[in-house]
């Protein structure tokens, strides 16, 4: 932070937040000059393109392998990092509940470690992270594996999280201009 001319990290974070607050972009392709019809076309068009690309990326055998692990598990804990991944973990928990599975969405790093300590060989940790590099999530996944649990990662390929997983569900979408995880990432996950 000091190398950028700030007194400390606090001042740097404040300046960054103020700068991002001035940015009116809600999507990488949308500009202030766009009318409503153009905004709709840009956002829905790029989302549709991302989903079409995802359709070609997903491996049905990988999804079957993940489904088998989930079906056999006595407990499924969904770990997430950040707002977008938290929404996805909550959604997955709800869907698993409807299938009669014992599932929990856990967003807090310390609670993830506690969960990982008790998952055991009949448990599955589903780790959801678009970037796949958050240290505390990687620590929880490592600990869950040490306890004998299986790990399903929903993340970008070639990330530390993907490399640690028993089953890796790769999700690649273009980055958003403002948010590191944008609309397409949320929908694709």
Q: What kind of feature is each model-predicted range?
A:
Residues 1-62:
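HTH-adjacent hinge/linker in prokaryotic transcriptional regulators
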Residues 8, 187-188:
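Short acidic-hydrophobic sequence patches enriched in Asp/Glu that either
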Residues 41-42, 67, 115-116:
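Short, flexible segments with low predicted structural confidence
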Residues 44, 188-189:
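A structural signal for well-ordered alpha-helical scaffolds and beta->alpha junctions
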Residues 61-75:
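Glycine-rich phosphate/diphosphate-binding loops that line cofactor/substrate pockets in enzymes
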Residues 71-187:
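Glycine-rich phosphate-binding loops that contact phosphosugars or nucleotide phosphates
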